[in-house]
Amino acid sequence: MEELDGSLSQTRKAHRIEQMVARWLRRSRDSSARAKVAAADGPPGNPAQALTPVRHTVTLDKDVLLQNYGFHISETLPLTVVAVTAGGSAHGKLFPGDQILQMNNELAEDLSCERAADILRETEDALSITVVRCTSGVPKSSFLTEEKRARLKSNPVKVHFAEEVLVSGHSQGNSLLCMPNVLKVYLENGQTKAFKFEANTTVKDIILTVKEKLSIRSIEYFALALEEQYSISRLHLLHEEELVQQVVEREESQDSRCLFRVSFVPKDPLDLLKEDPVAFEYLYLQSCSDVLQERFAVEMKCNSALRLAALHIQERIYACAQPQKISLKYIEKDWGIENFISPTLLRNMKGKDIKKAISFHMKRNQNLLEPRQKQLISAAQLRLNYLQILGELKTYGGKVFNATLMLQDRESYIALLVGAKYGISQIINSKLNIISTLAEFANISRVELTEESEKVSMVKVYLQDVKVLTLLLESSSAKDLACLIAGYYRLFVDPANSVFHWSGNRRPTHRVSAEEGYESRACSDSEESSEVDCVLEPLSDRCLVKLSLCRPFAREEQPPGDSPTPEATRRGPSTCGASSMTDSAESEASDSANTESRGCRTSGSSESMDALEEDDLDACSSSGTSFFHFGPPGFSKGLETNSQEENSRVETSGFLCLLDLGQNANPQCQKIDGPQGLASEACSWGPELSMGRLDPRLYEGSRTDYYNLCSSISPGSHLSDSGSESTASRQGAAPPQWCQQGWMEAQSGSMLESLGLPALPPLAFEGGSSDEEYYDAADKLTPPDTLSGPRAADPSAMRLQSQSRTRGSEESLHPGPEGGEPSRQGGVKKYAKSLRKRRSFLQTDHTSQVSFPLEASASQENTDDVCYYDREPYLTLTAPSPTVSSLQDMQGEPGLLETKALGLLASLRETKSTNPASRIMEMEPETMETKSVIDSRVSSISAIRLRIDPSNTENPVTTDGSSASIPHSPHHSNPGSSSPQAAQVRPFPIVSPDQDPGGTTPKELTAEPEDSTFPLSSDHPNPDNPGPHHVSQGDTSELGEVRSEIGSESFLINHVQEVIPQITGPLCPGDGPTSGECEVNSEETALAADEVQGQLSLDSDREVMHRNGPSLFQKGSGKDLGDSKGDRLDNVPQALDVRAPAGEINSSLCSEPPATGTGQTSSDSEGENREAQEQELLTELDLAPDFLLPSAFPPETIKAEQLDRVIGEDSVPVSTSQQVCVHTVPSLPKLSPCQEEPRSADSGHGSPAESKGDDSPIICLPPERSFLCFAPESHPEGSTSLSRVTSFSFAGINEVAPAEIGIEHCRCQFSYATCFRGLQPETEEEDGDPQTHPAAPLTSPPSAGSQVTLPWRAARAYSCTTPLSRKSHIWPEFCSRALRQLKTTPTNAPEGFVQLTESLLELQDILEASWGVGNKHPPDKCTLHFSESRSRLCMGSQKLLASCQHVIRMDQSPEEMQGAVRVTFQHLVQLAGLCFQFTDCSRCSTRHREVAGNLRDVVYTYHQFVEAAKLTCERGYHDFSVKLLARQCTALTAAVFCLTQKFRASTAL
């Protein structure tokens, strides 16, 4: 019963509550209804609804800047205020809708509209106006008035606002969508709008809706953009024709948010203020937000940021009607100083200094007015001045794109700047603010965007006057560029026309070279095509006058499909008359001829298009061919080069013009009349030909003519034999048939019709478009001897080389009995073409290498003598470096310096021209400017041609006996193609300039001092069947000064692609190894797939002396083995890296001084203890007594070189599991007495080619003894003695932190984002060391064993069966110690840079070998590890960049610079240690692998930075040295940016 009573009472209470709620609801409904009725029936003065009129009398000062009072009146009576200018004098005092009662004591009812307007114009100083205002009529939004709201209701739009909702219980955050069909748009005024979209809703619909909502008139300035959530600097424009559904479905859009921005910044903000005050206010708010978010921090100085903060504060004070004397304390307390100053300034400046600076600038801002002006500055003036200061920044008024510009004869990596003030410009030097205009928006006819690969796209900008600009960019950047150009075109040129139409569903149908006849401007698809710069060959510019004409620009502007292609063109190359050639040439319709190109071998830029697949042999030399313009028949009557009349006729007519440096015509070709004379002059050959060239008259005369030379050459516009004949002409064969048959008489009439030269381009293009173009021409024609080094070639050597090449050319003229028959060659070429597939290959971070099909062996049999080095197998990398600068030719040719990554830095062909390179600089001084990417913004695109010959059919040696020779030049690197083994071993062959143009290498090896040659034989031309190289003792090869001057200044680094040294060494006669020889067993050698096994027989009595400059090998006293101090020879360089000069020989060992007298002499007294030293070494190594010690190497060399290889001294990035064993011979031969030699290959760039081709054999211990060197406690004596030879050396590194720690003073030399080192003291910087971070998961815990530290280089430390990985028990032992040793090893100052180079090589070896599987972390903790890794990596990167800024300061001595370099190296090692600590899981392993590659790029780029610092210390602070150092610092900044970008721009997965 009690339970029943309780339930009844609860029921009663519930009913009572329900009744109470119902009563409340009923009362509220009744009261609202009564209120509505009262409002409808009540008097008009009811305060619930009636408008309360209020009279206001205000006095307005005339705005001096705008020359008005900041408001507009209606054109009809009654007089009302229609609009108020934002920031003007009337802003905040008058409002739209105010009815004017009185103006300057004149009643409005007595005024007409015209009279009121006159009063506004005539009043000089102040205007008194009385208005009546309804209090409830003030709009709730400063953007949206009542009348606008009514218009919106009467004119609905397609896109509807939607309320923000929660999806699946999660907050919206910064997501792109509120719900599946609702787009979230962020406005710069702080508002957020959500738009519901349908399947057919476009971006333009949303823009128009926002336009109506915000009452914006000038909507052409606005666009929607996607901002990456974790990288606010990356904004991607959306094309107005894109469907919103497609935008939100993209994978890359998931971590982005949509912004409504002023994406097209006006030239002058004053124009926008007068045109649309609302848009101007929006731009101002957007700019303030960008400054606070530090979008321009890379460019903005500290002083500018503080001045902008002062302007922002003053603008807020005036806009909010605050008292003018407001204190900064009030602002800081009520408003917050963080709303005006960026976080970086707040962190790095004291509050007292900030207040002082802002007060100073606020007083200074009052001076913006004229002195006689009495009124205060207005808010509009403050806003305008704010935007004008920002307009000085390139990143504000424009957007920077790093792209590959495809020019006529090469591709150039450039930094583009696109903006209202700049048009389409190229940044020549960002530090000096040197910009060259490429095109104006008014000259653009259309823009095309085509996809080249998943991550790379091509943008073609068609110009009205100069054909087309073709650019390769990342896909997102390419789309931004196209949208930006189209937007500015619509803004400044034609609002009704769009030059870029979006077709999101259209897929590109072709690549850079396509199957359907899409041709490259200067490429070839035949087997004779030269992959080295054809136009740089001595004869190409004179001989390859093709049967093609420069078409008028009217035809060139047509798109590829605008004009029909004749059947002759589609059918292929014409085989008969010139008439068919002319028809096909005139109807050829490709408009991309001057945009695509073959790879440039002169720039050496991996950031540029290093290679594009060639399309047609005739187009291979179109850069040289197109420079020939054939004129009327009278031209063929004769051309006497010594006749002023004829010279003037050529100059004025522009019929025949050839770009070159030569000024004198060939004396052998003078006084030759008729077509035979022309053929002889244009196609003659001989050792002295390069001295006779025609002046570049057409080029110097008109820039438009230069672009006229970019006409495309159709494959069907030439004779079928022209390719092979042109190639034969280029290589020194007989003149082509068209040169011998007087073809110009037959073609003169038809040629005149297509020779019309276009008019000059407008001044917009004339201003700066030729900077890069002239640079290209200079680069194209620069003699390689000036490019490769500052010193001139030895005349005797040049003469011998010329003779050698001449003989090789003569032998290559007739490769077979019928080799000269055009018909046979044509058939062979057709057969080869049928087996060859054209394709282009673009490599980015997301692409892989592509191998090309094999070529026909039959064609190679006939053409191998013609194009030998043309088919070098170029390999490239998987992790391209963003921007690396080449230090090549810093002394001899500063005019050709350019920001380039050291990609395929093949040596230019050796020419016989001795013309100085100064003429190039006289022709275009601007080319001396270095080109720099704008601070830390970088492109990761490089275009690569990958040539692989899996069947080893490339580069066959067609001559027997001595056909394979090692080319030699005192100024050029070894080609890497001296033998089939060398050609197949090298992943990065260096093409020698001394090779015969026909492809046959020189039959003689030139040695400069002796003025003699040394034939070198090859008994095993087949790479698949390697055997020992045998050369008689008299055949000792000496490679002299292999780019020694470049070796001291440049390190040929292409990411992880290695430069392989030429395989040379002590070679002995005989068919097999003798008792005094060390044979590398090829059966036990496991190399990578692209390597070739070989055996090396070493002579027991003779060694090869390799010269690398006069100071490389000097006589020095030997040091005792037990010298524990580790002193080295002062006169002997500390490192002969394989990376310094490309192809440099790593060993310098001699037992007998050569004839040159540059070798070290041996001492009889030093040879007495050889046997004892051998036994001691074997004891230290714990080797068997019968272990072989080759007689060619002293004990020190074995310890420094061979032991290094045993313990992992060198790294092989190409082969990870290489096994190299040495046969043991019972007898120990006599040792060479040479005592102290630098270790042989301390570079991480060695490849397996070193393993069998280096002078030092690779010793591989038995498996059970392979790791004994990493147990120093078990062999203390061996550890002690070996530590001396392999010790790390770097000038003055120490871990002592400065005593005084504090915030560094900013001198404002750089942007404020980089001029502060940060708040962390130096002691905190050491926290990044791998040994002092116990909280992070250590991959290499401290060793528990002996504290004896051996500075092992973490490279190839593995047994004969097990490859090294981070899981190996060696890794925790030597990696931590190696890094710690690198960071703490002190050195003396004189050898600082040399030893720093060694330490860098040690670090590179560690990086190459250490990155393996690594430790793991649970996937559920990946987010935590990611966040920690990102913060520490960014901190370490910031420290490194901050220390690098101290290196490039001008006000310091060389000693101070060396100290600053030491600090940077410490930070670099610390950064590497941070990366080593990364642990991974299945979710983040890919990102960490990319970090490994990017870290290697950072180290390589830092290597060049150190070289530039060394050059600056040696030469002093000259303008050129400082520019070079600054440019290298920029390259390093870009590399570090790429390292951290993966973490900044991605989430924790």
From Swiss-Prot:
It holds the Pfam family RA_2. Residues 57-135 form the PDZ domain. It is a peripheral membrane protein. It is found in: Cytoplasm, Cytosol; Cell membrane. Residues 962-980 have a biased composition (Low complexity). Residues 924-931 are annotated as: Important for interaction with GPSM2. It comes from the Eukaryota. Residues 1117-1130 have a biased composition (Basic and acidic residues). GO terms for cellular component: cell cortex; cytoskeleton; cytosol; glutamatergic synapse; plasma membrane; protein-containing complex. Stabilizes membrane-bound GPSM1, and thereby promotes its interaction with GNAI1. Residues 181-496 form the FERM domain. Interacts with GPSM1. Interacts with GPSM2. InterPro entries: Band_41_domain, FAK1-like_FERM_C, FERM/acyl-CoA-bd_prot_sf, FERM_2, FERM_central, FERM_domain, FRMPD1/3/4_FERM_C, PDZ. This is FERM and PDZ domain-containing protein 1. Residues 717-730, 950-961 have a biased composition (Polar residues). One of its GO terms (biological process) is signal transduction. Residues 554-618, 717-738, 775-834, 913-1046, 1097-1174, 1231-1257, 1321-1347 are annotated as: Disordered. Gene3D superfamilies: 1.20.80.10, 2.30.42.10, Phosphatidylinositol 3-kinase Catalytic Subunit, Chain A, domain 1 (3.10.20.90), Pleckstrin-homology domain (PH domain)/Phosphotyrosine-binding domain (PTB) (2.30.29.30). Keywords: Cell membrane, Cytoplasm, Membrane.
